[in-house]
Amino acid sequence: MAGPEPPMPLSRGGPGSASLSPPRGDRTLLVRHLPAELTAEEKEDLLKYFGAQSVRVLSDKGRLKHTAFATFPNEKAAIKALTRLHQLKLLGHTLVVEFAKEQDRVHSPCSTSNTEKKKRLDDTVENDKEKKEPDILTVENGIAPNHGLTFPLNSCLKYMYPPPSSTILANIVNALASVPKFYVQVLHLMNKMNLPTPFGPITARPPMYEDYMPLHAPLPPTSPQPPEEPPLPDEDEDLSSKESEYESSDEEDRQRMNRLMELANLQPKRPKTEKPRHVRKKRKIKDMLNIPSSASHSLHPVLLPSDVFDQPQSVGNKKIEFNISTNMPAAFNKDLETQPNNEEENSDSPDTGLDSNTGFGKIFPKPNLNITEEITEDSDEIPSQFISRKELEKGRISREEMETLSVFRSYEPGEPNCRIYVKNLARHVQEKDLKFIFGRYVDFSSETQRIMFDIRLMKEGRMKGQAFVGLPNEKAAAKALKEANGYVLFGKPMVVQFARSARPKQDSKEGKRK
């Protein structure tokens, strides 16, 4: 039979457009992604419900599987059905509808009367092919023909995968990172399943199966038990050994399967995180001598024995001399004259009189001038909360030691301002330790000084082991730099400098303005 003659090209608005039907390409629709759960009759009824005159449902195999051609009476009906069917979600599938192209006209129905005949012929031909060639391997039935795996899937084979856990997901991630092809295929699969792309920020962790699974106690170790029956005699030894081997193998298989099932249900244990061992460094005598006492940890300063007890005065060898004058009677006369005057003076003060009458009187120690000076200097401080100047001087290293250390080689104090920069801090240092040292330069009774006092200790990143301390004024900052620079805190000497301030360069701006 010859194919149908193509229609005459006519203008849309010319005469005869209403009587002549439009070309078949304009009224035949190709419907893709039909659900596999529907039968051919149900698919045909579905498309006829939307106004199709003739429907041809293709087979579920091949290039055009799960597709159908639907021919409508006119172009308007085809357009209306396309708008209603396109992107329609049906049983979890999204339909894709488009006008049939010229290359697909071979598969499209020729007339309404031939649809059922061709459908029956196709079904009979396919059934004959399946009956005649059941063992022939085709590319469509193969697992992965591109990789050489052309054998079909076993229909009886069913996989029972365990639920996802943290260890399984970690192993999958490791496989993704090590096999680039696997990574690309996973991205393709996510794209086909309309999952969100993994290129953005980290998404929230979904609830895992292991979070809701009850914990099982581990199996106790099985202790070896003696055999219940004694060994048989030598004659039946071969038979008994064979029977016992069969029985033991069956029992071992059962026990092994039971243990595997119990272990599969057990929640995986988290691997123990071993703490890195800290290697103790050998301390030098120089560092051990300069280690400060535990005063930085306590609120009250440590009192030295010299602060509590009187220091013994060094008594030198005194020479005793006697000057005996020759005019003894005259001296006695003078003493007798002075005695009544002394008695009158002593009568006014009774305490002194008692002292003069009884022995030598009270002996008081000499006042220690150094202690009074230190008390007057530290009177402005709060020794119970902050470090004293004496402890600062004791904990500092000498200038000779500063020259030997690499931290102080290129030391410069910087431009004076109210903020100081502290570096070379130990990792155990906390903000309260810095407050214990630099709080002595702040008057906490003043609200302004209390607000200006600020400590920022860097504990992470490349600024680790450094701190910025804000003091009320430049005078306090200069005093803190002078007294605290080189103080050994937790075995490391502090390096104290003035912080760099971002001041505007007035000279350069004025030169530009000029």
UniProtKB/Swiss-Prot annotation:
Pro residues bias locations: 217-230
Segments carrying the region annotation (Disordered) are 1-26, 106-133, 213-282, 337-363
* GO cellular component labels: nucleoplasm; nucleus; U12-type spliceosomal complex
Going by the UniProt record, its keywords in alphabetical order are:
Nucleus, Phosphoprotein, Repeat, RNA-binding
Instruction: Domain (RRM): give its ranges.
Output: 27-102, 418-501
> What is the first-listed, main subcellular location in coarse terms?
nucleus
The protein's matches in CDD domains, at most eight in alphabetical order, are given as: RRM1_RBM40_like, RRM2_RBM40_like
- Residues the record lists as Phosphoserine modifications: 21, 108, 349
Domain of life of the native organism: Eukaryota
Q: Where in the cell is it found?
A: Nucleus
Q: Where is the composition biased (Basic and acidic residues)?
A: 115-133
InterPro entries to which the protein is assigned, alphabetical:
Nucleotide-bd_a/b_plait_sf, RBD_domain_sf, RBM40_RRM1, RBM41/RNPC3, RRM_dom
GO molecular function annotation: RNA binding
Fill in the subunit field for this protein.
Component of the U11/U12 snRNPs that are part of the U12-type spliceosome. Found in a complex with m(7)G-capped U12 snRNA. Interacts with PDCD7.
Q: What does this protein do?
A: Participates in pre-mRNA U12-dependent splicing, performed by the minor spliceosome which removes U12-type introns. U12-type introns comprises less than 1% of all non-coding sequences. Binds to the 3'-stem-loop of m(7)G-capped U12 snRNA.
Name of the protein in question: RNA-binding region-containing protein 3
Name the source organism.
Mus musculus
